[in-house]
Amino acid sequence: SGLGDNNLATTGDPNFTPLGAPGSNSSSPNFTPPFPAYPSGHAGFGGALFQTLRNFFGTDDIAFTFISDELNGVTLDSVGNVRPLVSRSFASLSQAEEENGQSRIYLGIHWSFDKTEGISLGRKIADQVFNNTFRPNP
C-alpha cells in the first residue's frame, strides 16, 4: 500500500489489500513477505523454464493444462478447508509465463517491473545455458 515504507514522498493507497502468500497445510495465516522490490525470482524461474521449452520445441504455441499444488482438491488452507480442484489452461508458453510472473503482483510480493525484469533475466539465462550447454548427440 505504500503506507508502511517510511518514505514521506510515498502516497499510500489505504484501499490496497494484497492477497498475500497463501498458507498451505498449516494454520498459519496468509502473509506478504517484508522484503524490498527486486527482479522476481518466481518470474525468473518461469522465464527460464518457458524459454528453455521454446528453445527445445522451436515454438511458443504449445497449449497445455496445469493443476497447481495449491488448488489440487487436496491441499488445506490456513483454516483447514480443502481447497478446490482448479485446472488452468494456457494457449501458449508465453501466456503461462506471464501469468506466473503476474501472480507475484496479486500476492503483494512484487511490482510489475519486478515481473518484467525477472522474466527477461530468466530468458537470458535459459538462452545462455541452452546455446552453450546442450549439444546434440553425434
Residue spans of the language-model regions?
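Membrane-embedded catalytic cores of phosphoryl/pyrophosphoryl-handling enzymes
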Residues: 1-138
